[in-house]
Amino acid sequence: MEIVRDVESVRAVLRPFTNRKIGLVPTMGALHSGHLSLVHEMKKHADVVIVSIFVNPLQFSPGEDYEKYPRCEEVDCEKCASAGVDVVYIPSAEGMYPDGFSTSVDIGPMARELCGASRQNFINGIMVVLIKLVMQTNAHCMILGEKDYQMLHLTRQLFRDLNIGVDVLQGNTVRSAEGLALSSRHQYLSSAEITKANFLYGFLLEVGQQLSDDPHGQQEIIARGKLRLEQEGFEVDYLEVRDNNTLEHMQTFRKPARVFLAVYLGNCRLIDNVLLA
C-alpha cells in the first residue's frame, strides 16, 4: 500500500494504472466500520482503490469542530492496509488550498436546506473538495455513504451538471447492534450519551411507519416527532420528510420518501435518515 501526501505524488503513483478503473473513497479519517464497508464495496467496482483522508476546512463554519475533529493517521493507515486499499492519499490543507485559492462552488438552493440550513459552508465546501479529489486522482468512480444522503444526492447532481464523468456509488449505512448509524464524531459522546443516541434509529422507523399509516398527517407527525426528540433530551436541528428522488418538500406524503433528522446531544451533532419505499 502506498501513502502519498501531495497531488504530484498521487498522480505519479497512479500513473501506471491509466488503463485500470480507479475508485475513490473520500473520508475525513477517524475510520470506522462504516468507512471500511465503503472500501469493501468499492473493491467490487474498481481495480485500484484509493482512500483520501482530509479534514476539509471549507466545510466547517466558525465555531464548529474543525480543530478538534479526531485525527488518527497511523491507525487509519493500518485499517486501510488490512482492508486491501492500494493507495492512501493524505493531502495537507495548504496543499489543497494554497495561498490565493479563491474558487467556490454554489450547487443551488438545496445546499442551504437540511444540513445546509444550519451549517452555512457545509455542502458547497464539500463540493469543492470532491471536485479537486476526483481531478487529482483521475478516479472513474467514487462512493459515499447513505447516511450522508443529501451530500450523495447533490454530488450526483453536481457531477451531472458539470459533465464530470465519475460514477457516484451509494454505500449502505453501517449501524451498531443497537441501530445507531456509525460516525467518527461518536468519540465526543460518553457511554451514557451513546446509550441515549441508540434511540434515534428506532424513532426514525416509528416516524416512517406513522407517515405510511397516515399520509395526510405529515405536519402533525413531524411536529410530534420534534417534541418527542426534545423530551428524550436532544436538541433538534431538523426533522423532515422529503421526496427521495428530488429532496424537495412534499405537500402530500408519497413514496419513495426519506425521513431525515439532525440533532445535538451534548457537543455532538448526529444525523440519520431512513428510506420509505
From Swiss-Prot:
Its EC number is 6.3.2.1. ATP binds at residues 28-35, 145-148, 174, 182-185. Pathway: Cofactor biosynthesis; (R)-pantothenate biosynthesis; (R)-pantothenate from (R)-pantoate and beta-alanine: step 1/1. GO terms for biological process: pantothenate biosynthetic process. Keywords: ATP-binding, Cytoplasm, Ligase, Nucleotide-binding, Pantothenate biosynthesis. (R)-pantoate binds at Q59. It is found in: Cytoplasm. Beta-alanine binds at Q59. It catalyses: (R)-pantoate + beta-alanine + ATP = (R)-pantothenate + AMP + diphosphate + H(+). The keyword Ligase applies. One of its GO terms (molecular function) is pantoate-beta-alanine ligase activity. Pfam families: Pantoate_ligase. InterPro entries: Cyt_trans-like (IPR004821), Pantoate_ligase (IPR003721), Pantoate_ligase_C (IPR042176), Rossmann-like_a/b/a_fold (IPR014729). The keyword DNA repair does not apply. GO terms for cellular component: cytosol. Belongs to the pantothenate synthetase family. Catalyzes the condensation of pantoate with beta-alanine in an ATP-dependent reaction via a pantoyl-adenylate intermediate. The reaction proceeds by a bi uni uni bi ping pong mechanism. HAMAP family: PanC (MF_00158). This is Pantothenate synthetase.
